Amino acid sequence: MEKNKPLELALDLLKHSNIVRNNEYRFVTPDFGIVISFTHMESRLFRLGQPYRLKEGRIIRGLRGKARITINLIEYNIYPQTIATFLPGSIIELLEFTPDCDFQLIAADKDFLPLLRGDQLFESHTRQNLVMQVTDTEWKLSDAYFTLIWGTVQEVPFRREVVQHLLAALLHNIKYIRTEEANDTSRRFSHQEEIFWRFIALVNEFSKNERTVGFYADKLCLTPRYLNTLIRQVSHQTVMEWINQSVILEAKVLLKHSNLLVYQISDELHFPNPSFFCKFFKRMTGMTPQEYQKR
């Protein structure tokens, strides 16, 4: 694959690999895809410890085993009977998984859903609650949706409108589950935790350009000192540690999956000069940018 931009885990990857339809385990079009068993598909898309950017939104159902991942800096575990939704543009990194790990996946472009802009429907899922362990009843219902969508895509010709509406219904149902969780007082976030999640969203959005505590404090209408204290109390990390992690994540994506030179990546990430970027990268990772590229 030509390295001309940061690699996105996109439906295009499967399309360019001449994998358009596999009746046994997967079905893919330019703007919609479903995988009924990732293990049996024998995909080699993922490498441990390598960040990727998601082009389309994703729905994941954990079937067996366990996977440990990070989504936009935050670590999650995918267990059996887990449902996860990942927003378009998210950066995902697979940290580890058990040999028996298997899951199902639906990916859809933002323009695929007919009744509502697809990105709005995915965005309606709260950023701090991307992964849920669901009840037996909700798990069976999600299985019914996946089974119905899978059965529908086997029909010829492709029943696009039917799949669009089934997917919209599935996303709305997941939204209902999240709403119930949000109304559960035992799971409700504290005021400090709410600020933390707002801070993380801001870091993911602005860290390429803004790397001062004051910027994020202003956005949250707090003093820099109070923000630093609050973030440390909630996460056991400082504001700058979170910002630096976000910058490193973006740098890794650019180093591995673009044809940009190191000095161009330094400019892209708004470092004063390449030397400063290289020192920062080595301090954070223990290796130079060039060494990371060659791994």
Regions flagged by a language model, labelled:
Residues 2-4, 19-25, 94-151:
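A hydrophobic/aromatic-rich effector-binding and dimerization subdomain
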Residues 81, 227-228, 276-277, 281:
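Short hydrophobic/aromatic patch on the recognition helix
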Residues 233-275, 294-295:
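Terminal helix-turn-helix DNA-binding modules in bacterial transcription factors
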Residues 73-87:
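Short acidic-glycine-tyrosine-enriched beta hairpin
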Residues 68-70, 86, 92-97:
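Short beta-strand His + acidic residue motifs that chelate non-heme Fe in jelly-roll/DSBH
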Residues 133, 156-161, 174-201, 205-220, ...:
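Short, Lys/Arg-enriched, Trp-marked, Pro/Gly-tolerant hinge/linker segments that flank
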